[in-house]
Regions:
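Buried, small/hydrophobic-residue-enriched core segments of structured protein domains
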Residues: 1-30, 40-42, 84-93, 102-279, ...
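Gly/Ser/Thr/Ala-enriched C-terminal appendages of enzymes
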Residues: 2-30, 44, 276, 281, ...
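Extended boundary segments
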Residues: 21-79, 147
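An N-terminal, globular interaction/scaffold subdomain
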Residues: 57-63, 98-101, 105
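Short coil/turn segments at secondary-structure boundaries
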Residues: 71-72, 140-144, 158, 430-437
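Short, basic/aromatic beta-hairpin or loop at an interaction surface
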Residues: 78-92, 408-409, 425
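Extended hydrophobic secondary-structure segments that form protein cores and membrane-embedded regions
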Residues: 256, 283-286
Length: 447
């Protein structure tokens, strides 16, 4: 049976059982505020990168329960007839504020603030966490890799190392973190990302000789293509690659190294290319790279990097460990009550947060300021008084999605936004070693 285009069942069962219970006891329509945040950053991360909000808005557009889904939920005994009738006409009608995609975040940063009825807020929980926990982890890893690359382009080549759908979202998240292209055709088509790729070792092995394979590739892609030179002997591979390009009337664009001691081989290949007069031919390296391997290649004559497994799996941090908690609700008298979880190691701070980044006189960030218990309108003025840059934007108003917050143009803006946000962090943020967050988070209660 083909999968439904609706995103409403991409959720945990208890979201529906809570809805059913709340409908029965009359609390489903109480106004609530939920926040999505991380209690702390992973030990190896000095900052996080917001990615996935554009995908959330795309998914929210299709978040409704169709008749077949409702019948199945009822037949399974998951929902009652009352809940089934409610879901028939339900669509999210609340408000969502969030950090702009590409922004950096820290401990406690309210990446999303969802306001509406309890029914509105609870039904979205799993989908929001599923998307942001994955995409933020990948974008954060991508940012560390592009830091390590010091301006040399990084390309996503991880499609074969992830679930086919996860690979598409990972490619998008990698772009936000500073990557310049992807090998994944679906991601390139869907999000307007530059697509990259030439040939694998299998193409060389298919032909009777390496030179035959290179001649074929150059005939198809032109002399400016990238030729993989380590199928057999690297030294002879470089000779064959340069000669194949010149036989076609041009200079070779690049060679790719995918095995061996990449630092040593890069120096040898650069010397060989220069000796042959191929001074404009670039060197790209692949082979299970992560930010540490890229940093180790910093002094080598490498021009670009192709990253696969470590990128799409978050480079040791496969989830951003974000949570989604109610921070205030309406009581039986219609009054707003701040609520917080008090359990040790999993406590939360009650009340809506309005977030800003405080900058020092030198233009570098000094702290993440979270104003507690104020409205977004009042909070913006208070942030200005404190010299803090506002971090949240409205993504959904009364159920209406901001169309400018998703799509290929929004993705390009997110990448640019991330580079600006990262550049305003203190130098500690650029360290790859374990350590404290680049800036502290401070809560300030208002009123």
């Amino acid at each position: 049976m083909p999968a439904s285009t609706s995103t409403s069942l991409l959720t945990d069962m208890y979201e529906l059982t809570m809805l059913d219970g709340a409908l029965k006891d009359g609390t489903a329509h109480r106004r609530c505020t939920f926040e999505l945040f991380g209690r702390r950053l992973p030990a190896t991360r000095r900052f996080g990168v917001v990615a996935g909000t554009g995908r959330i808005l795309e998914a929210l557009e299709r978040f409704e329960f169709d008749a077949e889904q409702i019948d199945w939920l009822r037949d399974q005994g998951i929902i009652s007839e009352e809940a089934a009738q409610f879901l028939t006409t339900w669509r999210f009608s609340g408000d969502i504020w969030g950090y702009a995609e590409g922004e950096c975040y820290f401990s406690g940063s309210p990446l999303l603030t969802v306001e509406g009825t309890f029914a509105d807020c609870t039904l979205l929980e799993t989908l929001l966490l599923s998307i942001l926990n994955h995409d933020c982890a990948v974008a954060s890893a991508a940012s560390r890799m592009t830091i390590a690359a010091h301006g040399r382009p990084c390309m996503d080549m991880g499609a074969r190392r992830a679930h086919e759908r996860a690979a598409v979202s990972a490619a998008r998240a990698a772009i936000i973190g500073g990557f310049q292209g992807t090998s994944d055709l679906e991601a390139a088509k869907r999000y307007g990302i530059r697509c990259i790729g030439t040939a694998a070792h299998a193409f060389t092995l298919l032909h009777d000789s390496e030179r035959d394979a290179f001649d074929s590739q150059v005939a198809k892609l032109g002399a400016g293509t990238t030729l993989l030179v380590d199928t057999y002997d690297i030294r002879q591979g470089v000779i064959n690659a340069v000669e194949a390009a010149r036989a076609a009337g041009g200079e070779l664009g690049a060679v790719r190294l995918d095995s061996g001691d990449l630092v040593a081989e890069a120096f040898k290949v650069r010397g060989q290319l220069d000796a042959m007069g191929a001074t404009s031919t670039k060197i790209t390296v692949t082979s299970d790279l992560d930010e540490y391997a890229i940093a180790a290649l910093g002094a080598a004559p490498v021009d670009s990097y192709g990253v696969g497994t470590k990128l799409v799996t978050g480079s040791g941090v496969p989830t951003a460990a974000l949570v989604y908690k109610v921070v205030q609700r309406e009581d039986s008298n219609g009054e707003t009550v701040l609520v917080a979880k008090k359990a040790e190691s999993k406590s939360t701070v009650g009340g809506r947060k309005v977030a800003g980044r405080v900058l020092g006189e030198d233009g570098y960030a000094t702290e993440e300021l979270l104003l507690v218990g104020t409205s977004f309108e009042e909070g913006q003025a208070l942030l200005a008084e404190r010299g803090a840059r506002p971090l949240q934007v409205q993504l959904v108003r009364g159920g209406q999605i901001d169309a400018d917050a998703w799509g290929s143009e929004a993705l390009s803006r997110a990448q640019e936004r991330h580079l600006r946000a990262r550049n305003e962090l203190p130098y500690q943020a650029w360290r790859l070693s374990e350590g404290e967050a680049a800036i502290p988070t401070r809560y300030e209660k208002v009123g």
